[in-house]
From Swiss-Prot:
This is A-kinase anchor protein 12. The modification Phosphothreonine is found at residues 330, 628, 871. It comes from Mus musculus. Residues 253-543 are annotated as: Involved in PKC-binding. The modification Phosphoserine is found at residues 11, 18, 22, 27, 136, 234, 244, 270, 273, 350, 371, 467, 489, 505, 507, 540, 543, 584, 598, 613, 615, 630-631, 634, 637, 682-684, 733, 745, 767, 786, 873, 1059, 1292, 1351, 1355, 1357, 1546, 1645. GO terms for cellular component: cytoskeleton; cytosol; neuronal cell body; plasma membrane; Schaffer collateral - CA1 synapse. One of its GO terms (biological process) is regulation of protein kinase C signaling. Binds to dimeric RII-alpha regulatory subunit of PKC.
Length: 1684
């Protein structure tokens, strides 16, 4: 007809012309735009600018066509609508444009529908009239309108409707042309009818031109859809159908040019129709008139075609189309022979479906807006012809279907476009059976569109994925006009289309199968008989069944589809009976074969859908929530997705197979396949019966049903619908373990699928689908894995017997792998369980093998591995074992084990892991140390340390690895079993830490006896070691360098001595805690042995230095103690801080994780010691701090922390057991200023424990798991310490004893040194007594203040720094400020300098650790949070209160230097720190340095004094070290160990501070300012600050000035804590220099501490308040900095 021909003519003409005109028209300037000028301009404003343009173009095309050829207008309108959709699709290809196009498409489509409706209404008379005029005008309009229609409208229709045609195109290009014409009939009735008449009648230019234009459109859609092959085929087909090479040439040219031109042209023209139709709401017209317009167009164009012998030819064509459709159905194998092209198409379809899915969802809404966006999309559509064309086809198909449905359904279709449109479209199809070929295609389109609409309402993606191809492919067969060409092409395309149809109509076939088959039968010419339709019904029911399973994923669509299927089948048989009369039985067979082949494809993709079951697994997350519906949906969606992927693969394979096995398929499908299917289904059901747990009967019934279904598609449909209803049951299958009825229902769902799959698979197997079956089976297993995950997990939870049955089922159905697609659906459930079990067992065995390997100690590894093997779930917890054994790998055990590990961790004693680890490690490592200590302490100690560290780390790693591995295994099995498993595993990943933490806690409970024994052994070893350590510590610092390893031994010995003392006092104080403390002591001793190697090197010289300093400082401090009880302690607190810092630095020298662990431990000991000390009277606290400067405890704590790397689980147990580790760390820190901090930490026990968490996170890099463990440990410790804080308040001596050597010493100090504290404060104020008492004096007040500050700052700090560290640090900082205040400000300055270094480190890495925690952690604590809070007692107190604690230390430093300068610089430092908390720590550092320069005179004086004092203190310490070495040696050694570490760490923390120390300790004071600023920097530049601090500390060994650089280096070392081992000597020298600085500060501290102490105490209080305020203000920034 004229429209088609003129459209075609223009299309050829406009290939060159059309670019400009159509583009102009696209812009509204072309002739089409001119034609649409009147209407197009108004339309431009109607839906949207582009929409009006496109609608104007449509209306322009329509207007020209109305003027010239209503047929052309209809085609143009339809094409324009399609083009509008196509253009949108083209833009959709660019996702943003596509989305925009969707909105525009909705507007454009509605407008186009309005235009089409009005145009069709107007064109109804005009079409006939304009048929002659259309040739002339159509030539013009054909260029603009057809280019647009071909590009946009037909592309879209072909992408939706025409895609099927396109698929058929690839089969037969001429048929594609006919199909395109049919599509055009669907889209533009005249086009299809004219092609029908044109191909047969060849109405001159109309048919040729229309067919050529439509063929070009087909070719365009083909090129876009099917690619070069299909293009070539469509080119061949198009000339055949077009009967003119011009059609092909025009198609080729038009494809590139006309499509582009037509798309722009039609958008330009489309505004005309919106003008006409936009009076009515676009959507109303689009849905109401759009569908009616489509049908009207179909009827109009068909009347034209009827005028052009269309009715006869249509009937013939319909019959031929039905035959061709049957041929297509019969030729899914040929179609799959053309699979390569079809595979490409399907690949495109898959990709485009994804793209089209979006359009389908949005098309209804976007159709109106489509025209707006189409214009620019035209080029994109052509550029992305294949994708765009597919998308356009999908979109246009939706639009066309919607329009057709509207035309058919009318207003009712508006309400029920999805259901009524499809349902009503069928009656109109019947009504227009003469026009049913186009109408049929349209109803099919409507059905597809209904599908897509349903898809839009339900699963747009899933159903759209199915429905686009379904729509596209079926529409192509429906649109097939030419008989032979249509038959060949449609057979091919139907092969492709029917697979795609049935693939996508698997869900859509529910709707389309009835309606498409109606269309095929009714629209196909009514030749197809109801029997053929029944085959199709059988095909579609099975497809519907499977896709009910699939669309059960889109269950909302499923009812609609079922309704459509019911409507369609009920109506389709009528049409089929009416129209199928012409269809031959061979066609029925073909259709039967084709439906079965399509169904096979549909079913086969289902098999592969199980591969997308990964997506289903993802969906199974939702499925887990909605197991019944969602699992079915995810399975259906996964199957649909896999139907696409597999459809592509299998289509490539199956087209040939189907071609070869078309008859065999019939036999298989009709006869053998149904019987075989029944047999396979029954056999699989028999075997699957055990699987389905009583599903044998159901499957046997279903097998018989399938047999009957083969004979009776209706019954199959009913069964499929029943399975569709039961398809939710697969979703409910997870709960099917709960009930057999549900499981049976699931079996039913699976069984029909198996039956259909077995049929299809038998066919596929016959056709070589076995390969696909193997692929499909894994995919099924995967898809079913998700279902299995639900089912097996719940099975496991609910019945292991079911799993066993499932295993039996696996063996049975696994044996029946002929139905592998069927079997995998069920088999993978149990098989998966068995496989998972095997995997878990293998993994467990591997863990058993690997864990011992991972574990340094075979003892731990074996026992742990055994325990872990037993409790692969999370950790070696008896409760967890019970949970694991009870629940095994079921998802529930994860939560149960997670819950129980926590519970057990808290309440259950899991001494086996921790104790075994502890015993093995302690007995193994400690005896080795004891044995090897006499020999090469350095080498062996290092070895033992490494062994112990490795063992402890291995234990921790093993435990963590076990927990993680159990998690991983659980995750593996869980991920396989259930998303719940995954979520539980994700929780489990947390639980392992908790479990590890819990394990140590349990260890404490159950391992206390073991701990006592181990502690006794350790004490014996440690005694020897301690003696050697004493000797070594008596050795000069030169030996200390040699004693990098022996230090650890010394520490161990000290720890052992402390452990002995602690054991004695533990026994005295607390028998139950004694074991725990012993266990911790052993851990600490072990940790000391492990960690002490490096600290010892620091320890010996620094101990000497500390003794010297302790002596000097004790003299000074003693005087100061006499003068100021606090001042000595401050200096010693500095020493402790330095000692702690040095030790952690030494520790940090050894391992990063160790330091972190140590930090955690020091934090633990600090928290515990703080609690204990706060519990202890100030004197006790002073004594505990005095003796317990906790140097041993800090070393043990540090050692423990090192040990903790391996013993994170054990450590938590230790920490929980005695809270000793936190107490140790805090006791050590408390040694600095923790007396008050302990008081504050009494309030903060939980916080101190939380600080443990923070320290754990302090070294998150080294030990995240340990950190997590420590976090839970900290939490547990926090809980324990909170409980213990009450206990510790009474037991504080005990717990300090429990803490470690420091705690032991502290306990001794508390008990013995309770009096000794005063003595040592007076007599032994040298290093210990001096520290504690001032610290006690200052700390008790400040501890209260620290409590307030700790609670105040801690709470603010806590948010930033895990709040635990901040609180602890703040508490300590509070205590430390008190100590600082009480201490000589110089000592405070030194402490601040040290603590600033620590703080810098702390800023760098450490969250606001207590000053001593930082000291213990060295830079480590600093590494954690970078909170300036309390690297060292005083400064961290001042600083920790404000996260910019540095200001307070600065004030302290400057209090030493200048209270004015300190106040101003404190504020400056606070300001600097606040900025420094920001990234500019160096700038702040410089500012602090400037402040330091301001104080430089005083700094220089202090520097010289400090240098002199350092030397004198070193000598005095060396002299007094021998004296103090015997009694206070352990304390001194520990103190000095802590001091060196603290010095190293403090110096590391005080990058600037040590630099300032180089200036003097005034510069350290200023350095504190700068260090505080640098702490802020450290926060932002925690790594840099740590490295700088480590570097500076390294240099600090050379010189306090070089300490500046070494502090800078120290942060690096803090970063690389491993480097700290090498830095240990440097730390020793740093400790010496810092001891000198401490001595200087000590000297200074009498001067500064006396006057400035009070002032600074007030100033510190004020500054602490300020700091708290600032810190509260800065906490968030610092927390951010810490995070950053």
């Amino acid at each position: 007809m004229g429209a088609g021909s003129s459209t075609e003519q223009r299309s050829p003409e406009q290939p060159a012309e059309s670019d400009t005109p159509s583009e102009l028209e696209l812009s509204g300037h072309g002739p089409a735009a001119e034609a649409s000028g009147a209407a197009g301009d108004p339309a431009d404003a109607d839906p949207a600018t582009k929409l009006p343009q496109k609608n104007g173009q449509l209306s322009a095309v329509n207007g020209v066509a109305e003027q010239e050829d209503v047929h052309v207008q209809e085609e143009s309108q339809d094409g324009q609508e399609e083009e509008v959709t196509v253009e949108d699709v083209g833009q959709r290809e660019s996702e943003d444009v596509k989305e925009k196009d969707r909105a525009k498409e909705m507007a454009a489509s509605s407008t186009v529908v309005e235009d089409i409706t009005k145009d069709e209404q107007e064109e109804t008379p005009e079409i006939i009239e304009q048929i002659p005029a259309s040739e002339s005008n159509v030539e013009e309009m054909a260029q603009a309108a057809e280019s647009q229609a071909n590009d946009v409208g037909f592309k879209k229709v072909f992408k939706f409707v025409g895609f099927k045609f396109t698929v058929k195109k690839d089969k037969n290009e001429k048929s594609d042309t006919v199909q395109l014409l049919t599509v055009k009939k669907d889209e533009g009735e005249g086009a299809e009818a004219s092609v029908g008449a044109g191909d047969h009648q060849e109405p001159g230019v109309e048919t040729v031109g229309e067919s050529a234009s439509k063929e070009s459109e087909l070719k365009q859609s083909t090129e876009k859809q099917e690619g070069t092959l299909k293009q070539a085929q469509s080119s061949t087909e198009i000339p055949l159908q077009a009967e003119s090479g011009q059609g092909t040439e025009e198609e080729a040219a038009k494809d590139g040019e006309e499509n582009r031109e037509k798309e722009p042209t039609k958008p330009l023209e489309s505004p005309t129709s919106p003008v006409s139709n936009e009076t009515t709401s676009s959507f109303k017209k689009f849905f109401t008139h759009g569908w009616a317009g489509w049908r009207k167009k179909t009827s109009f164009k068909k009347p034209k075609e009827d005028d052009l012998e269309t009715s006869e030819k249509r009937k013939e064509q319909e019959a031929e189309k039905v035959d061709e459709e049957e041929g297509e159905k019969t030729e899914p194998a040929p179609a799959e022979e053309q699979e390569p092209a079809e595979g490409t198409d399907q690949a495109r379809l898959s990709a485009d479906y994804e793209k089209v899915e979006l359009p389908l969802e949005d098309q209804v809404g976007d159709l109106e807006a489509l025209s707006e966006k189409c214009a620019p999309l035209a080029t994109e559509v052509f550029d992305e012809k294949t994708e765009a064309h597919q998308e356009v086809v999908a979109e246009v198909h939706v639009s066309t279907v919607e329009k057709m449905t509207k035309g058919q359904g009318g207003a009712e279709v508006e309400g029920d476009v999805v259901v009524e449109g499809s349902g009503e479209s069928l009656p109109p199809e019947k009504l227009a059976e003469t026009q049913e070929v186009p109408q049929e295609a349209e109803p099919v389109e409507e059905l597809m569109k209904t599908k897509e609409v349903c898809v839009s309402g339900g699963d747009h993606t899933q159903l759209t994925d199915l429905s686009p191809e379904e729509k596209m492919l079926p529409k192509h067969p429906e649109g097939i006009v030419s008989e032979v060409e249509m038959l060949s092409s449609q057979e091919r395309i139907k092969v492709q289309g029917s697979p795609l149809k049935k693939l996508f109509s698997s869900s859509g076939l529910k709707k389309l199968s009835g309606k498409k088959q109606k269309g095929k039968r009714g629209g196909g010419g009514g030749d197809e008989e109801p029997g053929e339709y029944q085959h199709i019904q059988t095909e579609s029911p099975e497809s519907a069944d499977e896709q009910k399973g699939e669309s059960s994923a889109s269950s909302p669509e499923e009812p609609e589809e079922i309704a459509c299927l019911e409507k369609g089948p009920s109506e389709a048989p009528q049409e089929a009976e009416a129209e199928e009369g012409a269809t031959s039985d061979g066609e029925k067979k073909r259709e039967g074969i084709t439906p079965w082949a399509s169904f096979k494809k549909m079913v086969t993709p289902k098999k592969r859908v199980r591969r997308p079951s990964e997506s289903d697994k993802e969906e199974e997350l939702d499925k887990v929530k909605s197991a019944t519906l969602s699992s079915t949906e995810s399975t259906a969606s996964g199957m649909q997705d896999e139907v696409r992927a597999v459809g592509e693969e299998q289509r490539s394979e199956e087209p040939k197979r189907r071609v070869d096995t078309s008859v065999s398929w019939e036999a298989l499908i009709c006869v053998g396949s149904s019987k075989k299917r029944a047999r396979k289904a029954s056999s699989s059901d028999d075997e699957g019966g055990p699987r389905t747990l009583g599903g044998d009967g159901h499957r046997a019934e279903e097998a018989s049903k399938d047999k009957e279904a083969d004979a009776l598609p209706a019954s199959t449909q009913e069964q499929d619908q029943a399975h569709g209803s039961s398809s939710p049951e697969p979703a409910g299958s997870p709960s099917e373990g709960e009930g057999v009825s549900t499981w049976e229902s699931f079996k039913r769902l699976v069984t029909p699928r198996k039956k259909s799959k077995s049929k299809l698979e038998e066919r596929a197997e016959d056709s070589g689908a076995e390969q696909l079956a193997s692929e499909i089976e894994p995919s099924r297993e995967e898809s079913w894995v998700s279902i299995k995950k639900f089912i097996p997990g719940r099975r496991k939870k609910r019945a292991d017997g079911k799993q066993e049955q499932a295993a039996v089922e696996d063996s049975g159905p696994g044996e029946i792998n002929e139905d592998d697609p069927d079997v995998p659906a069920v088999v993978p459930l149990s098989e998966y369980d068995a496989v998972e079990r095997e995997k878990l067992e293998a993994q467990r065995a591997q863990e058993n093998v690997e864990l011992p390997q991972l574990k340094g100690a075979v003892y731990v590894s074996e026992e742990l591995s055994k325990t872990l093997v037993h409790t692969v779930s999370v950790a070696v917890i008896d409760g967890t074992r019970a949970v694991t054994s009870a629940e095994e790998r079921s998802p529930s055990w994860i939560s149960a084990s997670m819950t129980e590990p926590l519970e057990h961790a808290e309440g259950v004693a899991t001494p086996p892991v921790g104790e075994v680890t502890e015993k093995d490690i302690t007995a193994e490592a400690t005896p080795a140390l004891a044995q090897t200590l006499p020999g090469g302490k350095d080498a062996h100690d290092d070895i033992v340390t490494s062994e112990v560290d490795f063992t402890s780390e291995a234990v921790t790693a093993a435990e963590t690895t076990e927990a993680l591995r159990a998690e991983e295994l659980t995750e593996a099995s869980g991920a396989e079993e259930t998303t719940d498993m995954v979520s539980a595993v994700s929780q489990l990943s947390d639980s392992p830490d908790t479990t590890e933490e819990a394990t140590p806690v349990q260890e404490v409970e159950g391992g206390m006896l073991d701990t006592e024994e181990q502690e006794r052994q350790t004490q014996a070893v440690l005694q020897a070691v301690a003696d050697k350590v004493k000797e070594d510590s008596q050795v000069p610092a030169t030996q200390t360098l040699q004693r990098a390893g022996p230090k650890a031994l010394e520490k161990v010995e000290e720890v052992e001595e402390d452990s002995e003392v602690l054991a004695t006092e533990k026994e005295k104080d607390v028998v139950p805690e004694g074991p725990v403390q012993e266990a911790e002591t052993e851990h600490l001793a072990q940790g000391s042995e492990t960690v002490q190697a490096t600290p010892e090197s620091l320890e010996v010289p620094e101990v000497t230095e500390d003794v010297d300093r302790a002596t000097t400082c004790q003299v000074i401090k003693h005087q100061q103690l006499m003068e100021q009880a606090v001042a000595p302690e401050s200096s010693e607190t500095l020493t402790d801080s330095e000692t702690n810092g040095s030790t952690p630095l030494a520790d940090s020298d050894t391992p990063n994780g160790t330091q972190q662990d140590e930090t955690v431990d020091s934090q633990d000991s600090n928290a515990i010691a703080a609690v204990k000390q706060s519990q202890v009277t100030e004197e006790e606290a002073a004594a505990a701090q005095t003796e317990g400067p906790s140097t041993p405890s800090s070393f043990p704590a540090q050692e423990e922390h090192r040990e903790k790397p391996g013993r994170d689980v054990l450590e938590p147990t230790q920490a929980l057991a005695a809270g000793a580790v936190p107490i140790l760390a805090k006791a050590e820190v408390g040694q600095e200023g923790e007396a008050g901090q302990f008081d504050g930490e009494k309030v903060k026990d939980g916080q101190c424990v939380k600080e443990l968490e923070v320290p754990v996170h302090t070294g998150p890099n080294s030990q995240k798991t340990a950190d997590l463990t420590r976090d839970s440990e900290v939490m547990e410790v926090a809980r324990c310490q909170e409980t213990e804080s009450n206990e510790e308040q009474s037991i504080s001596p005990e717990k300090r004893e429990m803490g470690t050597d420091v705690e032991k010493e502290e306990t001794e100090t508390k008990t013995e040194q309770a009096s000794e504290e005063h003595e040592q404060e007076t007599a032994a104020p040298e290093h210990e007594g001096t520290h504690p008492k001032p610290v006690l004096t200052a700390d008790m007040p400040h501890s209260e203040r620290g409590k307030a500050l700790g609670s105040l700052e801690g709470s603010p700090s806590l948010p930033d720094q895990d709040k635990a560290d901040c609180i602890e640090v703040q508490v300590q900082s509070s205590d430390t400020p008190v100590t600082q205040t009480t201490e000589a400000v110089k000592k405070v300055e030194e402490t601040v300098a040290t603590s600033e270094m620590d703080e810098s480190l702390e800023c760098a890495g450490a969250q606001s650790l207590p000053a001593e925690k930082l000291s213990e952690t060295g830079g480590y604590g600093t590494l954690q949070h970078g909170e300036d809070t309390v690297p060292q007692g005083p400064e961290s107190q001042a600083e920790s209160i404000p996260i910019i604690v540095t200001p307070a230390p600065e004030s302290i430093l400057h209090s030493d230097l200048q209270r004015e300068v300190s106040a101003s610089q404190k504020q400056r430092s606070d300001e600097d720190n606040k900025p420094d908390a920001g990234p500019d720590a160096a700038g702040k550092e410089s500012a602090a340095r400037e402040k330091i320069l301001r104080a430089e005179p005083e700094i220089l004086e202090l520097e010289s004094k400090s240098n002199k004092i350092v030397q004198s203190v070193i000598q005095t310490a060396v002299d007094q070290f021998a004296r103090t070495e015997t009694a206070p040696e352990t304390h001194a050694s520990d103190l000095q160990n802590q001091v060196p570490v603290m010095q190293a760490d403090s110096q590391g923390a005080q990058q600037m501070l040590d630099k300032d120390e180089s200036d003097l300790q005034v510069s350290p004071q200023d350095g504190t300012l700068s260090a505080v600023a640098q702490e802020g920097l450290a926060v932002s530049d925690s790594s840099e600050g740590m490295s700088k601090a480590s570097e500076m500390i390294t240099t600090l060994a050379v010189e306090s000035a070089s300490v500046k650089e070494s502090v800078e280096k120290l942060p690096l070392q803090c970063k690389d804590e491993k480097e700290h081992a090498a830095d240990g000597p440097q730390h020793q020298s740093l400790a010496k220099a810092e001891a000198d600085a401490s001595g200087n500060l000590t000297k200074e501290s009498p001067d500064t501490n006396g006057p400035k102490l009070t002032e600074e105490g007030d100033a510190l209080k004020e500054e602490m308040n300020k700091a708290q305020t600032e810190e509260d203000d800065l906490q968030e920034p610092k927390g951010d900095l810490t995070e950053s």
